[in-house]
Curated annotation (Swiss-Prot):
Lineage: Bacteria, Bacillati, Bacillota, Bacilli, Bacillales
Pathway participation: Carbohydrate degradation; L-arabinose degradation via L-ribulose; D-xylulose 5-phosphate from L-arabinose (bacterial route): step 2/3
EC number: 2.7.1.16
Gene symbol of the encoding locus: araB
ATP-binding in keyword set: yes
Keyword tRNA processing listed: no
Protein name stated in the entry: Ribulokinase
Organism: Staphylococcus aureus (strain MRSA252)
Length: 545
């Protein structure tokens, strides 16, 4: 009997799972919020811009060390039988280190400098750099731009590097290496300096055949190419391969065998496809958490406007992986729940239920459109298909009779409409969608939301029993790297998570949602394309004030 470890680094917490490689059984698990959480608003008591989202990398090591120690102790499994470790991580979450892989934010002189810290995926401080990169690419007709949806996001690696170059050159001077936080964990485990093809391909303008796009970098900033060459470029390891064995000192520290193999890191949402067994084309998978990623696989590389990238072999060898997404889903619902009236909070507490459960109870018998509300779910910008992190959310149709649960439902529907925009974009660019999977903690807990989604999309929805699909996917890669399975496909077949339930659309609801979707799309196009300056003009007062 052999086992593998999957370490899943999410936005707010980390998870360490011990998985049976034969049948995918969860033998032990460890879940812990990050000690420093997401650093927003202020850093060590000092105010930082509202577009910043940072983290402390020491939290990542804490998760790994405490988690592995716990699962080995709790399971009583002989560490010799743990053959591999897989890592998944939010992305693009980037870290700046010295030549010994020590994060520069741990240097005393940079304790209060936000640019020394990990830049979390939802850090939007590099929006000016992203715009410059995009405009330069457009002006020079760069051929790669279509592979990234004809856009550049401030959430990606290169704009974030440019941000530090421009605003904190003293940090860049002390930095020896820049990498995805997922690569950093892998390198700490193996004492190597490598990069994953998944992270580079989706977030750093790198392609397997041509490498980095230095011709573009040279035109953006004469210094950029050298920074990438010196600090980012490193040997690349593909998904499905092994980086190598655990470093001897790390094996001793973690209580594992030094023969334990480590796989390259995979982006967290991408790991979910492996965890639920979506390994074919014509299947769209919604990985739903704080944000939602919409992933597809295809034999060909299509240039789909508004997506976040397409990379060969980033999930399944020989297939192109496509990513699109929404920047605020679980985060948005949490925001609404926190605004709930005291009477709702008290009622939920008295009935021993959550505010979410209470609001779902209040809306579950409503018909689509009953509240008269429609919303735009852009509270953290719009990732796809508008690719504009400076857009903001809004809600229409409020009256003095509007109840809090009506607002909640409007936001549930808005995220479903945003997903339909993405699905239609895939379909419009030669990527047929026959199956839709939903995975993550939210689909498993919120049947009302799944009912909304199946009717908005007018597709059968396959809801997975998969609150921890990324961790399972990471463990699958660990199992492959450790030799427990001959291929990713074999490992997926043996270790994937089961289906929880399937739900089909209802004709009357579908028809009503078609009317609502037309209204959503009209508002989407007005405030996203035609008059996007309205929101941005208001936001400029916030930035300047």
């Amino acid at each position: 009997m052999s086992y593998s470890i999957g370490i899943d680094y999410g936005t707010a917490s980390g998870r360490v799972f011990l998985i049976n490689t034969t049948n995918g059984q969860v033998v032990s698990k460890f879940v812990k919020p990050y000690t420093h959480g997401v650093i927003e608003g202020e850093l060590n008591g000092l105010k930082i811009p509202h577009t910043y989202a940072l983290q402390n990398s020491n939290d990542y090591l804490e998760i790994m060390e405490e988690g592995i120690s716990y699962i080995v102790r709790e399971s009583k499994i002989d560490p010799v039988n743990i053959v591999g470790i897989g890592i998944d991580f939010t992305s693009s979450t980037i870290i700046f280190t010295d030549e010994n892989l020590n994060p520069v934010h741990n240097l005393k002189q940079f304790k209060n400098n936000p640019h020394a810290y990990v830049k979390l995926w939802k850090h939007h401080g590099a929006y000016k750099e992203a715009e410059k990169l995009y405009q330069t690419a457009i002006e020079n007709n760069n051929k790669w731009l279509g592979h990234y949806g004809y856009n550049v996001s401030s959430e990606w690696m290169i704009p974030k590097i440019m941000e530090v170059m421009n605003r904190a050159p003293e940090i860049m001077e002390k930095t020896a290496y820049i990498m995805e936080a997922g690569d950093w964990i892998v390198n700490k485990l193996t004492n190597k300096n490598v990069r994953s093809n998944c992270g580079l391909g989706f977030k750093a303008f790198w392609e397997e055949e041509t490498g980095f796009h230095y011709d573009l970098f040279d035109k953006v900033d004469p210094k950029l190419s050298k920074v990438i060459q010196d600090k980012v470029s490193a040997p690349v390891v593909n998904i499905g391969e092994a980086v190598g064995k655990l470093d001897d000192k790390m094996a001793q520290k973690l209580g594992l065998s030094k023969d334990t193999m480590v796989s390259p890191f995979i982006i967290d949402a991408h790991a979910s496809l492996l965890g639920i067994g979506s390994e074919k084309d014509k299947e769209m998978t919604m990985v739903m958490g704080t944000s939602t990623c919409h992933l597809m696989l295809n034999e060909k590389q299509h240039q789909v406007p508004g997506i976040s990238g397409s990379v060969k072999g980033a999930i399944i060898p020989e297939l192109f992986a496509y990513e699109a997404g929404q920047s605020a889903v679980g985060d948005l619902f949490e925001y609404v729940a926190k605004q709930a009236p005291k009477s709702y909070v008290d009622e939920a507490a008295n009935r021993n239920m959550t505010v979410f459960e209470l609001m779902n109870e209040k809306i579950k018998h409503q018909m689509p459109g009953e509240s008269g509300l429609i919303a735009l779910d852009w509270h953290n910008g719009n990732r796809s298909v508008l690719s504009d992190s400076n857009l903001t959310g809004c809600i229409f149709g409020l009256t003095l009779q509007t109840k809090h649960e009506d607002i909640y439902r409007a936001y549930l529907e808005a995220t479903a409409f945003g997903t339909k925009m993405i699905m239609q974009q895939y379909q419009d660019w030669h990527m047929e969608v026959e199956k839709v999977f939903a995975c993550g903690g939210i689909p498993k807990k919120n049947a009302v939301m799944m009912d909304i989604y199946t009717n908005v999309l007018n597709k059968k929805l396959i809801v997975m029993d998969s609150e921890y699909a990324p961790a399972i996917g990471a463990a699958i890669l660990g199992a492959v790297s450790g030799g427990a399975h001959n291929s990713i496909n074999d490992a997926v077949d043996a270790m994937k998570e089961p289906i929880l339930y399937e739900i089909n659309p209802e004709a009357e609801k579908v028809q009503r949602y078609e009317t609502l979707f037309k209204a959503y799309k009209a508002l989407h196009d007005i405030h996203g394309y035609k008059k996007a300056n309205i929101m941005k003009d208001i936001q400029s007062l916030r930035v300047e004030g």
